[in-house]
């Protein structure tokens, strides 16, 4: 084994681990970094404590553990063990544990010091899974605050060294060149006129005919694997075995795909990107790369994940091609043009930038970290997705302010997806716990085959579900319960209330309680049910409606009886403007879904008034009768806030008045029971009564409604939103006034509109004194001829004012 490529850098690596808290190892697939190196570190690395080796996938974790144990002549559970969901194989003498991602996070949460652990190894880190990024952030925090003696080794086939070195500038970088045979890389664009699965099968069959050896065929998803397998089966010889390989396959089926082909046989492994790096598949010499992958992208707006088929990065193409050169010179056929390959992105996007972050946020809050920026990340979790995660945790009653509630702490301790954790913690006895545990097991590994009826899946006795349910029952500290189909709906509603669905007019179309649309296949038998709970949804790319993958028919009225808190009852009164009347009814809702509506014979005055206020807010203040006096009062208050800002004037713009209807309008509405009475309401009086007495006095003295001119006439002042206040007065009544009158403690001059005897404007001025001494002369000349019976003095500033003609002056 010492001939493995990574053996050449072992002394350098051991030295780095002795002297540095973090070490980066870059070693290509097949170099021995997973299946040989950990044993050498265990034997020679002077590690003080156990070694934890993180593998991103369950199959890889089990295979690595078995291989390491074989090298020691042992079985897993002795020196080398493994831990994964629903399966643990460790013993009292285990010193090297191979674990999957969620398991490592649970270990850190339960024992933040990682007592007894000397080294944590993160393998295949280039895959940048969400859990791997979280594990790195938590481990670095442990090193900084609790365990400066803990060692961390980050291993990858294609490390993003530049970014990791920015995050860990002191970490030594060890590079193993690896051992790979030459790979001839060919490029073949698929014909545009041919179906994808047909074209891929033709290209793969042709390569099999012209070359010897087994083949690894990369496809974006399970559907493509199944369809290409059908097409390829028609085209290959009898000595070729077709083996699918994807994450949802049972582990026994996955193992068949990675074992060598029987003697005299060839094998074609049809795989998703699960086979890019973390699994060693025996006997592969040929690779056909569809150059596509299917990735999950979270939509923060809908709270759903959609699957997107996209071109892979150049780094992934290189990894896929490398699979052909592990044992001998090989061939990789990329199913796209070389120019397209060269234009592909250099690296793929990490999961943390495009995933649902509710589980991550729950883990961070359990860790005591309210702000993710407090930890060290290669990529900071996006604020938009974090906000969506916070909304979900709030809806699940997991938060009190910025921290976890008592319920949230129970959820976090389980280590499940937040919705499933909420459902599990809702169990109150052994039977409901058994029901919740089985439901969680089903939703973690949903059934395949197109049956969307959750009740049918629940009735099945499937081994992996039963094993997982038993594990969850232990976590819940319940024993002996029996799953009860009658409690499924209530348990689902505790975590998926927003996914209660009501059938719309079209067949298979539903509306969810969160307002979104959802749909079943047109021929799905579930479509005959009026109400469903749909815990498993997928956001489609072709339709705005989500696709229902798994759902339960429910009796909505029985569900509300079981879970009264689900429903919101409200008495609603709305006006019918066409009829000039108010309509009242009692409405029962779950989210945005109306369950039942009943007429209300006699709503209370409070309900009537609230309906009127709601109607005003919807239609605007114009529904009230704004007399000129009411509008002028509003404008005086508006101006007072600008001119006398030292006083606490109420805001009277439309938005503010609508927001404060309960404070200024409602007190005037006693006895108002109809729209006619509402329209007769005195708005001016309502605004005036809203003002405290001192402010009312201040307003009347400093922004009066009228100004008394020299003749003693009280002339109305006109106030405006944006223009200065104006006074329209006959010029003769202003004789004897030497300067422009002011208001608001002398801060604001009035604009004088000086009128002719016929009430037509002669002059508009804000400086009366300057007008008397200046342009008045021109006005005097013209007016003497036009209105000879009126007084037009040479010195108006010192002439007695008059309302009369000369005859009566």
Please provide the spans of the model-predicted regions.
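P-loop NTPase motor module signature
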Residues: 1-423, 538, 722
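Generic recognition of stable, solvent-exposed alpha-helical segments in well-folded globular domains
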Residues: 12, 32, 36, 59, ...
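Extended active-site and interfacial segments that coordinate phosphate-rich ligands
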Residues: 111-126, 136, 290-294, 303, ...
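Short, isolated positions in well-ordered beta-strands
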Residues: 181, 518, 714-716
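C-terminal accessory/connector segments of nucleic-acid motor ATPases
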Residues: 334-462, 466-470, 474-504, 508-522, ...
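Acidic, serine/threonine- and proline-rich low-complexity intrinsically disordered segments
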Residues: 399, 432-517, 530-706, 745-809
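C-terminal accessory/binding modules appended to enzymatic or scaffolding proteins
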Residues: 686-748
């Amino acid at each position: 084994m010492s001939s493995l490529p990574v053996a050449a850098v072992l002394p350098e690596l051991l030295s780095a681990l002795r002297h540095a808290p973090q070490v980066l190892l870059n070693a290509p697939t097949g170099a021995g970094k997973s299946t040989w190196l950990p044993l050498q570190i265990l034997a020679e690395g002077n590690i003080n404590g156990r070694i934890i080796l993180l593998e991103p996938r369950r199959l890889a974790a089990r295979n690595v553990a078995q291989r390491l144990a074989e090298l020691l002549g042992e079985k897993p559970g002795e020196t080398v063990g493994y831990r994964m969901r629903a399966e643990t194989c460790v013993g009292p003498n285990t010193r090297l544990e191979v674990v999957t991602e969620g398991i490592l996070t649970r270990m850190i949460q339960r024992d933040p010091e990682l007592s007894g652990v000397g080294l944590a190894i993160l393998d295949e880190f280039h895959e940048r899974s969400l859990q791997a990024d979280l594990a790195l952030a938590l481990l670095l925090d442990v090193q900084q605050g609790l365990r400066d003696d803990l060692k961390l080794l980050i291993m990858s086939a294609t490390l993003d060294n530049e970014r990791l070195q920015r995050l860990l500038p002191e970490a030594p970088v060890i590079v193993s060149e690896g051992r790979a045979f030459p790979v001839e890389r060919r490029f073949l664009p698929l014909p545009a006129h041919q179906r994808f699965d047909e074209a891929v099968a033709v290209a793969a069959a042709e390569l099999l005919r012209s070359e010897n050896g087994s083949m690894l065929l990369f496809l974006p998803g399970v559907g493509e694997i199944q369809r290409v397998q059908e097409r390829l089966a028609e085209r290959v010889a009898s000595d070729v075995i077709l083996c699918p390989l994807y994450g949802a396959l049972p582990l026994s089926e996955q193992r068949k795909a990675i074992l060598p082909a029987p003697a005299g046989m060839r094998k074609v492994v049809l795989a998703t990107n699960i086979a890019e790096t973390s699994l060693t598949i025996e006997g592969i010499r040929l690779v056909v790369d569809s150059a596509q992958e299917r990735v999950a992208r979270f939509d923060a707006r809908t709270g759903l994940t959609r699957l997107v088929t996209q071109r892979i990065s150049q780094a992934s193409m290189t990894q896929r091609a490398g699979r052909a050169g592990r044992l001998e010179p090989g061939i990789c056929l990329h199913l796209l043009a070389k120019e397209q390959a060269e234009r592909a992105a250099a690296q793929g996007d990490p999961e943390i930038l495009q995933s649902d972050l509710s589980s991550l946020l729950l883990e961070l809050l359990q860790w005591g970290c309210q702000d993710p920026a407090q930890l060290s990340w290669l990529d900071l979790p996006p604020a938009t997705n974090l906000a969506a995660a916070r909304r979900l945790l709030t809806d699940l009653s997991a938060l009190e302010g910025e921290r976890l509630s008592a319920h949230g702490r129970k959820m976090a301790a389980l280590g499940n997806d937040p919705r499933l954790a909420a459902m599990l913690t809702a169990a109150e006895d052994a039977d409901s716990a058994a029901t919740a545990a089985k439901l969680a097991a089903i939703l973690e590994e949903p059934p395949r085959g197109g049956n969307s009826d959750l009740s049918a899946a629940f009735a099945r006795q499937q081994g992996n579900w039963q094993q997982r349910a038993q594990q969850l029952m232990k976590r819940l500290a319940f024993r002996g319960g029996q799953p009860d189909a009658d409690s499924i709906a209530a348990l689902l509603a505790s975590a998926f209330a927003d996914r209660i669905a009501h059938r719309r007019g079209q067949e298979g179309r539903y509306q969810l309680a969160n307002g979104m649309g959802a749909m079943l296949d047109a021929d799905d038998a579930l479509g005959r049910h009026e109400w469903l709970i749909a815990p498993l949804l997928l956001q489609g790319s072709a339709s705005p409606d989500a696709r229902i993958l798994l759902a339960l028919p429910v009796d909505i009225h029985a569900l509300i009886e079981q879970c009264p808190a689900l429903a919101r009852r409200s008495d609603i009164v709305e006006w019918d403007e066409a009829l000039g009347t108010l309509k009242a009814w009692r409405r029962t809702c779950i989210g945005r879904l109306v369950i039942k509506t009943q007429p209300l014979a006699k709503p209370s005055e409070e309900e009537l008034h609230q309906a009127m206020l709601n109607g005003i807010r919807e239609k605007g203040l114009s529904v009230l009768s704004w007399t000129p006096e009411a509008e002028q009062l509003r404008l005086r208050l508006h101006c007072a806030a600008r001119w006398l800002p030292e006083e606490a004037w109420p805001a009277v713009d439309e938005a503010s008045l609508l927001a404060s209807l309960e404070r200024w309008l409602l007190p005037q509405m006693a006895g108002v029971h109809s729209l006619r009475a509402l329209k007769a309401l005195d708005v001016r009086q309502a605004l005036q009564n809203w003002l405290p007495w001192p402010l009312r006095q201040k307003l009347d003295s400093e922004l009066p409604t009228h100004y008394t001119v020299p003749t003693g006439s009280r002339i109305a002042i006109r106030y405006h939103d944006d223009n200065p206040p104006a006074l329209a007065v006959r010029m003769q009544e202003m004789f004897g006034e030497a300067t422009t009158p002011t208001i608001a403690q002398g801060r604001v001059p009035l604009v004088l509109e000086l009128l002719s005897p016929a009430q037509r404007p002669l002059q508009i001025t804000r400086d009366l004194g300057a007008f008397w001494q200046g342009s008045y002369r021109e006005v005097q000349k013209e007016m003497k001829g036009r209105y000879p019976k009126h007084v037009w003095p040479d010195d108006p500033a010192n002439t007695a004012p008059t309302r009369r003609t000369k005859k009566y002056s």
